[in-house]
Amino acid sequence: MTTESMTTESITTELLSLPLDELLKRAAAVRDRRYGTRVTYSPKVFIPLTMLCQDKCGYCTFAQPPARLEAPYLTPEQVLDIARAGAAVGCHEALFTLGERPELRYRVAAQWLADHGYASTVEYLVAMCRLVRDEVGLLPHANAGALSRDELALLRPVSASQGMMLESLNADLDCHRGSPDKVPQRRLDTLEAAGELQIPFTTGILCGIGESRQDRVDALVAIAEAHRRWGHVQEVIVQNFLPKAGTAMHKSPPCPHDDYLEAIALARLILPEDIHLQVPPNLTDDFGELLNAGIDDWGGVSPVTADHVNPERPWPALERLTDVTEVAGHVLAPRLTIYPEFALDPERWLAEDMRFGVLDRSDAEGLGRDRDTATGDPSAEVWYSGADTEPPLVVEAPNVSATGALAELMRPATAAAGSAVRGAVAEVLDGVRMGQVPGEDEIVTLFGARGPEVRAVAALADELRREIVGDEVTWVSNRNINYTNVCTFKCRFCGFSKGPLSLNLRGNPYNLSLEEIAERVVEAKALGATEVCLQGGIHPKFDGDYYLAVTRIVHEAVPDMHIHGFTALEVTEGAKRNQEPLADYLRRMKEAGLKTLPGTAAEILDDEVRQVLCADKINTEEWLHAHRTAHEVGLRSNVTIMFGSIEHPRSWARHLLITRALQAETGGFTEFVPLPFVHMASPIYLQRASRRGPTFREVVLMHAIGRIVYRGAIDNVQASWVKLGLGGVRQLLRAGVNDLGGTLINENISRAAGAEHGQMATEADFRALVEPLGRRLVQRTTLYGRVDDAGHARIDTEASRNTGLNSALVAGA
C-alpha cells in the first residue's frame, strides 16, 4: 500500500481499520527500508529568546506574563553565553524558541524592542541568529511560529533551518481559544511559504489536546501534500500531550499511550518516506518502545540547557539514549539542524552565508561531526587529523575467544547489553565472510557504520589482517626529501606548494640543489635509512631530465639506497616535457635507479571531485595509466587516498574499486595508505570551501574497509602516524592495519598543511606502540622484505608473496 495518491477518506478506511500491532509493523518496515538501523539526534542548546507570547494555549507552560520575567527578552550577552556553553560541549544547533508576536499583546515587549532598535520580535530574532552564527559558529534553527513569507525570508540568510508545529487543523479546539497564531489556515500558509522559499522545515502534530484520530490524519495529509509540492519538510515531530500544573489543561488526561503509538505509525505511513519522523524522548518514560512505531530521530538533546517547553521532563543523558537505541538494534548518530538530504544540496537549500557553517560541522555523509574527544569529556580538546591530541576511543580491545572466533569479535565488550549488529552493515559483513568482494553500494553502506557497527567492521578487518599477514607490524627507516615547494599546479588542498602569486602558508619558496639532495641521502644512510622518498612541486623550470638527474645523484651517492619517488603527476609531466612516451621515460628512470613510485597525486580518483580539488592536475585515467605503465616496466607503487575534504563515501568506494581492478590487472601495488586531509592551513579550508578533515570514525572505517575491499589483492594497509599521531595509529592496529610506514625524517608536507606531529619517529616509538598490543615490530624494506640486525636488506620469500605482485612482474623487477 502506498500513500502517494491516497485521499484522506481512503487513508481513514485503509489505515484506521488496522489493528495497532499491524500499523506498528508496517511503519517500522517503512523506516527500516528507508533509513536502516540509523537513528539520529541533534546536539543542541535551547535559547528561549522570549517567553512572552500573544497566544493563550491551554497546555503551555513556556509562555509567561511580564511580571514573572526579569526582562522581556534575553540580551545579546545572555544569548552568547548560552551558545558558547553549548559549543564548548560539542553542540551543533542553536534552537531559538520564543513566544509568537508578544509585542502585539504586551506593551513592555514593544517598548523593549523599540528601545533596542528593533521593529519586531522577528527582527530581533534575525539579529540574534546572525550573532550566534558569526560569533560562536552554531547553526541557528528558528522556531518562531506562524510567520509571513517576508518574515521567513528575513530569517533564511541567518538560519540553517526553520520550524513551526502545525499541531492540529481542528479550528474548534478549546486549548487554542484566544490564540490567533493557532488559526489553522495561518499555519498552513507558513508551511506553504517555507516551501516556496526553499527553507528546510520542521513541523509536526500534537496528540491528545482534544483532536480526533481523523484530525491527526488530516494534519498529516496536509503536511504530506505541502512536501510533495516543494520537497522542504525535513522532519515531522509527533508529540504527546502531558498535563502541566498551572495551565488550563492541568486536569486533562495525558495522551493515551496506544493513541500516541498509533499517531506515530500513521505519520510514518502517511508521510512521504523522505520525511524524517521524530519523537521527543523525554516525554515518554519507556521511550525505547517508540522505535517500534517507525521513528528515526530523537530530536534535539541538550547537555547544557533544559527543555524550556517541558521543564519538568529533562532530556535523557546521551549515554542512556545511546544504550536504549542500541539495545533495540539501532545505532545513534549526531546530526545537524539541517538533515543530510538538504545539507548535501546547499545551493538549493541554504543561503550563501550559511553554507560554510553547515559544511564545517558536517561529516562525509552530511550528518553532524562526532565529538572527537579522547576521554569522552565533551569539553575536552577535539581531535582533528594532524592535531596533537588523542583521538576518541572508537575501536576498543575486542572480546577475543581462545580460538579467535569471528563470532566473538562481532560482539565487542563495549556494546550495550543486549545489542547486536543487524541490518545492511551486518549483511555486507556476512557477504565478506563468505568471500565476496563488496560492490560500490555495499562499500558505501560500510562507510555509514556507526557505534557497534564500526566495531564490527573493524573486528572483521582485523581478523582478515591476522589471516593474511599475521601479527607482525612492519616499518621502514626512511627519509623524505622534498626538493622544491614551487609548483605550477593549483591544487586547492595543498599547503606545501608555493608560487609567486599563491598564499605563503609555510615559509619561502625553495629549490634544493643536486648537491644538497646528495648530502641528505648520505645523511639518511648514516641514520640507518634504507629508503629515501623523493617528492616535490612541479617547478616551471623542471623537465623530465631533472628527475633523471635527481635519481642518478641519489643512486651515485648511496648505491644501495632504495629510491622511492616521483608521483604519477611528476613522471607524467616529466615525460610530457621531454616529449617522449611515458613507458620509455619510466624505463630510463628505472635504469637511473628508481625502484618504486608513491601513490600520492591520487587524492580522490573520482573526476567530479578532482575538478574541485585539483582541476589542472592529471585526471583519474591518467593516474591509473601512470601506475599501470610503471608496473609494466617493472616499477612498483602504492595506493593512497586523501579523504575528508569535500568528497563523500561514494567517491571513496569508487577509488577503492578502481584501484583494486588495476591491482588485479598488474599486481604492482604493495600497500594501501589512507591519508586524512589536514585542514588547518589548507587553502581550500581557509577559503571556507571544505570540511575540516575526516572524523576519527571515518579514519577507522577507511583503514578497515580498505583491508576488506583489497583482500586477495593488496596485503598491506599502512597508517600515517604523521597525520594521525601514534595514539590514532594504536587503534588502527586493531582495525586491519599492519604497517606503520616510515620514520620520515624531514616530513614536511603534512606539517605545511598544519599537522602538529613531529618530523621523525624512532624505532623505540614504534616499539612502545606495538608491543603492548601483543604484536611484534619488524623492520622491513620498501618492498616488504626484511632488514637484518645490521641494517641490511634480506630476501624474505613470504614477505615477497605478501606484496601481492604477480610472478611475471617479480621476474621483470
Describe the residue ranges of each PLM region:
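Conserved short loop/turn motifs at secondary-structure junctions
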Residues: 14-15, 43-48, 140-144, 207-210, ...
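Mobile, glycine- and charge-enriched loop segments
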Residues: 39, 43, 53, 59-67, ...
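Conserved Radical SAM active-site core
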Residues: 64-228, 415, 420, 498-654, ...
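N-terminal [4Fe-4S]-dependent radical SAM core
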Residues: 11-58, 62-73, 77-78, 82, ...
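Hydrophobic faces of well-ordered beta-strands that scaffold small-molecule active sites
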Residues: 39-45, 94-96, 140-142, 162-164, ...
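Auxiliary Fe-S-binding modules of radical SAM enzymes
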Residues: 1-25, 29-36, 80, 87, ...
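Conserved, mostly hydrophobic/aromatic
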Residues: 27, 57, 96, 164, ...
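Short, small-residue-rich loop/turn micro-motifs
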Residues: 53, 61, 98-100, 166-168, ...
